[in-house]
Amino acid sequence: MSKLTKRQKEINSRIEHEKQYTIEEAVQILNDLPPLKFKESIDIAVNLGVDPRKSDQVVRGATNLPAGTGKTKRVAVFAQGAAAEAAKEAGADIVGFEDLAESIKAGNMDFDVVIAAPDAMRVVGQLGTILGPRGLMPNPKVGTVTPNVAEAVLNAKAGQAQYRVDKAGIIHTTIGQVGFTAEQVIQNAEALISDLRRAKPATSKGTFIKKITLSSTMGPGLSIDPVPYRTAK
């Protein structure tokens, strides 16, 4: 068995593994941990009362986070004509059409989000085996296939959390950075969970928001009391 590092020992001394924390308490703990050489994300995992094996219970979407994510994302847009110009004005980092597709095929992947106008999907569709495994394939369910590419660019730049339930019925996404205030994380978490409640499949029965966990990139997973988040505020 590998030895615990000094940081791991300190983490273990600060947390109660059986406790359910408030988000405010959890953020305080994560912010007070010994800092690393990089800025850690604050991530959330929400266990949902769904069976993702059933196609009508696959929960997928995107939430515009009120406090952002703390990171600036590079955005690539597939568009032409007026839509391409609008994307550039909105702050897109890369805008193109067939030329962008060829660049991606050549291995140029210097972006975090891909947005496409509907008429560009005939081009983007050729990139499924490249973009799909990386979670970058545009999809109308998360607002990345849209006639209003400028708005999508603004949302991505402002801080948007995309999510899709995994095989275990859990969504994982980033809702901030270490250093965010508790209020910022609470605002983002409430916005996300509110969207999740609205996305509850009609065939999902029983408790929908089953469990919530907050963590930092290299920090502990802290169990959050889910009860206050099961109903609209």
Swiss-Prot record:
MF annotations from Gene Ontology: rRNA binding; structural constituent of ribosome; tRNA binding
InterPro entries listed in its UniProt record: Ribosom_uL1_bac-type, Ribosomal_uL1, Ribosomal_uL1-like, Ribosomal_uL1/biogenesis, Ribosomal_uL1_3-a/b-sand, Ribosomal_uL1_CS
Entry GO CC: cytosolic large ribosomal subunit
One Pfam family per UniProt: Ribosomal_L1
Superkingdom to which the source organism belongs: Bacteria
GO BP: any one term: translation
Keywords for this protein: Repressor, Ribonucleoprotein, Ribosomal protein, RNA-binding, rRNA-binding, Translation regulation, tRNA-binding
Keyword Manganese included in the entry's annotation: no
Keyword Ribonucleoprotein in record: yes
Function: Binds directly to 23S rRNA. The L1 stalk is quite mobile in the ribosome, and is involved in E site tRNA release.
NCBIfam families referenced in this protein's UniProt entry, alphabetically: rplA_bact
Family: Belongs to the universal ribosomal protein uL1 family.
PANTHER family, sorted: 54S RIBOSOMAL PROTEIN L1, MITOCHONDRIAL (PTHR36427), LARGE RIBOSOMAL SUBUNIT PROTEIN UL1M (PTHR36427:SF3)
Quaternary structure note: Part of the 50S ribosomal subunit.
Protein name: Large ribosomal subunit protein uL1
Annotated organism of origin: Psychrobacter arcticus (strain DSM 17307 / VKM B-2377 / 273-4)
Gene: rplA
